Amino acid sequence: PNKSTLFPDGMPYYYVRGEGPSIYERLYARLAELKVNAVDLRAELEGSRDTYFLRDSHWNEEGSLVAYGAIRGGLGYPEARDWGTADDILVHTGDLDAMLHPLTAEPEALPHRTTLDAYAIANDAQGVEDAYVVTAAAGNPDGQTLLMYRDSFANNLLPAFASTYRSAVFTKNVPYNLGDEQVGFAQDVVIERAERHIASFATDPPYMYAPERTIVSEGREEGSVAVMRVRDADPYIVIEGSLDRDLKKGERVYVEVAGDAGEVQAYEAFRVSEPRVSSSDFEGQGASAQQASVIKDDRGFRAFVPKGHGGMVALGQIRLFVGTEQSCREIATEAVV
């Protein structure tokens, strides 16, 4: 959670919370509706100011261990590991302090448990802030394996997980590559994302094969126009673009692709929104700004489909549909870029 979500009384007087549910609350309501295994850390962290740095937007070691215990519980492990009490002091310069006082920032004392140092970095990463970190814990030869998609909030979270798992991979790269062989390698997969980055779920959907669907077409929707682009992104073909209208509740977007042998398969596309800021919004790990050229407002779509035997699929072999699997309508695809 954002620091301001947990401690709104610490915000300036002119900071006024908006009406209605927050994006955080809407996300967790939707995850519950879809029965996604999600851990809401807000209840775990609320009320304890000792869990976040004073002059930093992130949680400190205390907060990270609260999060660690809750996440491990969400993974089905009955008891969180006891890391003991702090027996060392580190120093940390907060991101807020560095922004507000670049010349006079004051490092904060960070009580540290050396029991969290029971791991080694197994790749060429220099530390927990690197975008891709592989770890090994020699004390856990029969332990589990972990893949964590994460952001900077996991800088303090990484040591506890790295010390718990025999082997672990921590990556900041987005979009998430859910087709990566590492997903199969890991016994546990965790997605940690800061509240302030929730919106990028809508702008950077993960790399993964679009789910196959069997659709029933009810004909053509007259007057509807779509802009579509097809590009190669090995091992995928990416079909993306924008609709000229909002989808009604329950409607989805499908792309139908004819293969080299004449076979036809429909896939469900991700709904995608246009990034509101630059592609470096997600801590410098964002995807190319090129995506925004055909994704407009919140009417975008993107599907990663398998390549045909001949490589790129010809443009004439693709049709776009909106609706549901049981009843959808083809929309015009003449405007192809």
Name each model-derived stretch.
Residues P1-V337:
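Extracellular glycan-modifying ectodomains
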